[in-house]
Amino acid sequence: MTITNTIKSLLKKKIPLTVIHVTGDNKHINITAVSDIFNNINTLRRQQIIYKPLMPYIINKTLHAISIKTYSLQEWKNK
């Protein structure tokens, strides 16, 4: 399983996401996540929600750079 598929599966398992896109390689990952759990939550807290299940991969240096974009379902529809 590729790192992008691993991340996608992990995030889907840990967070109730409506949409999840993960692209990139072992060093640079781009994540777009959509969920109603992001309603009324600031950007920092949204990123913390995504980072939490990824911490083991960051600590062991499997992941180096991560770009995260998060949206509530309404924000995604308006995008």
From Swiss-Prot:
Family matches, as InterPro entries: BolA (IPR002634), BolA-like_sf (IPR036065), BolA/IbaG_stress_morph_reg (IPR050961)
Similarity comment: family membership: Belongs to the BolA/IbaG family.
Alphabetized Pfam families for the sequence: BolA
Protein name: Uncharacterized protein bbp_348
